[in-house]
Design a protein with these regions (language model features):
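Conserved, well-structured functional cores that handle cations and Mg-NTP chemistry
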Residues: 1-284, 288-293
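Generic structural signal for well-ordered, non-membrane alpha-helices
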Residues: 24, 309-312, 342
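Compositionally biased, low-complexity linear motifs
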Residues: 90-100, 145, 226, 316-339
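Generic recognition of short, well-ordered alpha-helical interface segments
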Residues: 280, 302-309, 335, 339
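Short conserved micro-motifs at the rims of enzyme active sites and ligand-binding pockets
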Residues: 296-298, 351-352
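Short amphipathic alpha-helical "interface-anchor" segments enriched in bulky aromatics
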Residues: 297-325
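Basic, amphipathic alpha-helical segments enriched in Lys/Arg and hydrophobic/aromatic residues
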Residues: 320-370
């Protein structure tokens, strides 16, 4: 398995180049992070490699992982040091900064699948969703003896496939925090994921991402627009219809583009109705964005499935199904390491494609079929 391969690769001269190439995008990232510090016992750079290798390694728990790499890796931290570092607020800030820098580099080097539609120029587009890990071994139980899964909210850049961790669910006031409550706790900068001022941001969410009052505030104050689907019990008052170019291939399947007023919010939002030509299914999409062709609104929502595929990767490729530790900081650290590992994999896949012509043809076919 790749995880074991990368942990052994550190000293095995036969396969050393693969590890060097896999981790190459991380070179010098530590030096550019404001929270980086000189730590002789376990450097920030070594901590990045330990955490990422923990994600891709095959061992089922932290103790077994540290034991498996200690004979080959001289920088292996002691078990107590590993778990203490997981709970370090400073290291978490550093890891977030490193992932943000890596995501920015991905935007400079990876092909942009949205570049084919000029109308999207000036928009950064992210798919967001919640994801759960099983409770950690030492997580507290409630009065009934129940441990609750740990919820996280992530966002995937649909231009680069770079993965960002937004936050862990409230560990104190909620047993299971709703996505919208997590979103409302975030700073404006966090919700824009490093997007430069002047560039609009589109967040594509499932039905858990609907709050029309908040959508309006995000649009007016932050330049953030939402795309989602209506819940079954929502009631709308029909407003004026929007004109669109039915002859444009991007609008294939569009049967309506109209403004509607939700019963709970008497400001118009946009509703696009789409019939899938292949399956005959009718979908309705809601958005606070008023200018893009309706077919692009639908296409962006369909691309939201990409983040579900990343979650499948977390669970069934990385085998990351359980929280590593109990503190909120440690749980966030694990989530950021998952993002770093995914982002390095995306860059490595690009290298394999460009230099060796190796592609994941089966997944490419599945994705084309979804879209």
């Amino acid at each position: 398995m790749l995880g074991k391969f990368l942990s052994m690769v550190i000293i095995d001269s036969c396969i050393l180049p693969l590890a060097l190439r896999f981790f190459a995008p991380m070179a010098d990232l530590a030096d550019s992070c404001p929270s980086a510090r000189c730590c002789p016992q376990l450097s920030d750079d070594a901590w990045l490699r330990v955490g990422i290798t923990r994600v891709v390694d095959d061992e089922p728990n932290g103790r077994a992982f540290l034991q498996s790499i200690s004979p080959e890796w001289e920088d292996t931290p002691a078990r107590s040091s590993f778990f203490d570092t997981l709970a370090s607020e400073r290291r978490l800030r550093f890891c977030r900064e490193a992932n943000a820098a890596l995501c920015a580099n991905m935007g400079l080097t990876l092909p942009d699948p949205l570049a084919a539609w000029p109308a999207l120029k000036g928009f950064a587009v992210f798919a967001g969703d919640g994801h759960f890990h099983a409770a950690a071994v030492h997580d507290a139980r409630d009065a009934d003896g129940t441990k609750y899964a740990t919820g996280h909210v992530y966002a995937l850049n649909l231009r680069t496939h770079a993965m960002h961790h937004l936050d862990v669910g409230d560990q104190k006031a909620r047993k299971k925090e709703h996505d919208m409550r997590t979103l409302k706790r975030q700073s404006p900068a966090a919700l824009r994921f490093g997007t430069p001022t002047g560039t609009k941001v589109i967040l594509v969410w499932d039905k858990a991402g609907i709050d029309f009052e908040w959508w309006l505030a995000c649009k007016n104050n932050l330049g953030i627009y939402f795309i989602s689907r209506p819940k079954e019990n929502m009631v709308f008052t029909n407003g004026p219809e929007n004109s669109y170019d039915a002859a444009d291939p991007v609008n294939t399947g569009i049967v309506a583009d109209e403004l509607v007023a939700p019963a709970t919010h008497m400001r118009y939002v946009r509703r696009v109705t789409f019939i899938n030509p292949a399956k005959g299914e009718t979908w309705q999409i809601l958005t606070s964005e008023m200018t893009l062709p309706p077919g692009l609104i639908v296409k962006l929502y369909l691309m939201r499935w990409d983040i579900e595929k990343v979650y499948d990767e977390f669970k069934n490729k990385f085998f990351e199904k359980k929280a590593w530790a109990s503190s909120a900081t440690a749980k966030c650290m694990q989530a950021v390491f998952l993002c770093l590992a995914h982002n390095l994999m995306v860059l490595h896949e690009r290298e394999l494609r460009q230099e060796h012509g190796i592609t994941n043809e089966a997944e490419d076919r599945r994705r084309a079929k979804r879209l």
